[in-house]
Amino acid sequence: MVFGKNIGDETICVVGLGYVGLPTAMAFHSVGFRVIGVDVSDRVVNKLNDGESPLIDSSSVIEIPVGSNRWSVTSDFEKSVPESDVVLITVPTPVNPDNSPNLEYVKSAARSVLENVDRNRRTAVVLESTVYPGVTRKVLGELCESMGLNNEIVTLAYCPERVNPGDFERGIESVSQIVGCDDQVVGSQLARLFAKITNESSTYVGKMEVAEASKLIENVQRDIDIALAN
């Protein structure tokens, strides 16, 4: 693999341990990866380290792997990011009062990640949060440029989260994955990486904007289906 390891040997860092990030982190752990979960909330970190789920109505179906030597949870970006081969950003993207997208969580998480990458190795930074086409390149790409992080240090990608928050019975393994990345080699490797956690397809689709647009179209289709049903 381009990160210097065989697929399956990577350390995966998941930033944002909510309804998307926590199941994603646990899915990678369950298939053998070393996983570092990062969250800025002390409540979330403390609950997970005590073996409790911070998610409402999930305790009966989510078992936190406390005690596993492949699982750790922290709020410390400085220690966790440099140890990781792949960093997944799974933070919320709410809307502002005027219905414009609020990207502050994405910007804050991306900045904390990029400030702490190991410049002596390549790290794949994958945004999973729901965004409009162009955000990964504009927000994360411009941060990389301002910090002097070229593609040999940080390779950006987008893989839209497609789980249904709160649906703990139909998990991430039931959802197909798509990956957009300007680097075809890394994008293809990331698609194979995500294939480890799903029973459905995992496909490299080319540019990041293609993957971003696919999530937007999926959401529009869902809204149309709901409107027609009503």
Where are these regions (language model features)?
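Conserved N-terminal Rossmann-fold NAD(P) cofactor-binding segment
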Residues: 2-10, 34, 40-86, 93-100, ...
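Glycine-rich Rossmann-fold phosphate-binding loop(s) that bind the pyrophosphate
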Residues: 17-18
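N-terminal Rossmann-fold NAD(P) dinucleotide-binding loop
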Residues: 21-22
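Gly/Ala-rich phosphate-binding loop of Rossmann-like dinucleotide-binding domains
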Residues: 25, 29-30
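Glycine-rich, N-terminal phosphate-binding loop of Rossmann-like dinucleotide-binding domains
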Residues: 89-92, 129, 182
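Rossmann-like NAD(P)(H) cofactor-binding subdomain of soluble oxidoreductases
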Residues: 95-162
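Internal alpha-helical scaffold of NAD(P)-dependent oxidoreductase catalytic cores
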Residues: 142-158, 163-230
